[in-house]
Amino acid sequence: MGRDKEDKTEMDSVVPWMRAPVDVSNVENCALDTLPCLNPKLKKALENMGISSLFPVQVAVWHETIGPGGFERDICVNSPTGSGKTLSYALPIVQLLASRPVRCLRALVVLPTRDLALQVKDVFDAIAPAVGLSVGSAVGQSSIAGEISQLIKTPKLDAGICYDPDDLSQNLESAVDILVATPGRLMDHINNTKGFTLEHLRYLVVDETDRLLREAYQSWLPTVLQLTQTSDDSLFPSFTPFVPSAFGSLQTVRRQSVERGFKGKPYPRLVKMVLSATLTQDPSKLIQLDLHHPLFMTTGGSRYRLPEKLECLRLICETGMKPVYLVALLKSWEGEKCIIFTSSVETTRRLCKLLNFFGDPKIKAKEYSGGLNQSLRSKELKAFRKGDIQVLVASDALTRGMDVKGVTNVINYDMPPFAKTFIHRAGRTARAGQAGRCFTLLSNHEVRRFSKLLEKVGSDSCPIYPIPPTSLDSIRATYTPALEKLKELVESEAPKKGRQAFRHNSRTGNSQTKLNKPRSEA
């Protein structure tokens, strides 16, 4: 009875348009040859990517944008990791912009992290040039001046003639049709870049929506909505965002029913697409998006859903034995790609060092976390994708959206704190219809909490994965010297306070590092 009441309360808090979703699981894959209205040039580009058919979520979105739906409603997608959400919005946007008369910024894709934004840009880069579209990025990978030179086209000047800079700014044009951006750098261009305008924007994609709505990110969303609001919209406002009084160089706002350069042409409304594997159902957050008759697409009836071919497994051990169990797993997967997730940047660094101190030539681990600079993260991720390294030890910087082909195993070295964290971590494997496994290392006191987490994500089965005791005994002998090397490294690098904290963790078994000796050896 209590459970029924809880479910009813949760249902009452859901916005009405989410109560009757389109179930994507009822849609079948569709071969490119039978996909209606697909531009032949885009078909060729997709085939060059090795794509011969579209996944269900991609087919469903296509029919609501290019097909009978005709983008009459804003699209909201809640679909498992690895189901193909990026191409589900990239393909129809590129198809619709292929016939654009002149180049100007018409599509904006916003993502929470630089790594994810660069990955999405790669998808657009693979298909947009086939129909003559240009794609830019504003993610902070290069200097602001370098980005401006790629985003803004300056007029050619006659030599020997002096020009007023204010006159030149009136003739600046966009050099891109599609922009992939992170919120911070987007706001930099809105406030400071001459010639950067959202006046002609037609499509706004908010990827990883729940994370982008969780933080303000310099009020990027209300700013974008205000700058793309027409005078017609303001007659019946449904959303009143906060916008700073001035936007630096960006003074243009969307004009009423007329597009600049095409006199008399009706100005279409701004179409929005919001996507996530764990889309929020909080009305107070969703209202910020100012959605137009939104259509909700989801896979099944649950907010959280794991990939269909994912196998969940768990290992229960003493906290101090976690590294031993971890190495035993890695030894049994020679040549298979694996991502290990930890709870913090510091644990990621120490665990990576510890694995390499074991001295096993079959285990070559690299770190991927927010503690590394962008160039080093990109380097390690590239090596992992190429297969030069098989083991990546990661913080939650890699949990959302990152797509690495061939990852067959994911290990939660530290138990995920939330159901959505588990969804995003596990989703690094079993992508694009492939099989994969997710292992979670648990201490005895975490078993009950993990069982509740599994209920939330709808996992019916997560059996214990057996490891032969003989395998553990052989690894235990090399664990102690490896741990001693790690302690020496930490003490040589860390300040006095850090050394004291590490000694304290080693004595008390603090779960922040979980890299202390087995109790039998303590």
UniProtKB/Swiss-Prot annotation:
Keywords: ATP-binding, Helicase, Hydrolase, Nucleotide-binding, RNA-binding
Chain segments carrying region Disordered: 490-522
Domain Helicase C-terminal as annotated: residue spans: 325-475
Domain of life of the native organism: Eukaryota
Motif interval(s): Q motif: 30-59
Feature: compositional bias, Basic residues: 497-506
Catalytic reaction list: ATP + H2O = ADP + phosphate + H(+)
GO molecular function, one term: ATP binding
EC number(s) reported in the record: 3.6.4.13
InterPro entries: DEAD/DEAH_box_helicase_dom, Helicase_ATP-bd, Helicase_C-like, P-loop_NTPase
Binding site for ATP: 79-86
Limits of the Helicase ATP-binding domain: 66-297
Residue ranges annotated as motif DEAD box: 207-210
Any matching Pfam family: Helicase_C
Annotated domain remarks: The Q motif is unique to and characteristic of the DEAD box family of RNA helicases and controls ATP binding and hydrolysis.
Family: Belongs to the DEAD box helicase family. DDX51/DBP6 subfamily.
Name this protein carries in UniProt: DEAD-box ATP-dependent RNA helicase 1
Organism: Arabidopsis thaliana (Mouse-ear cress)
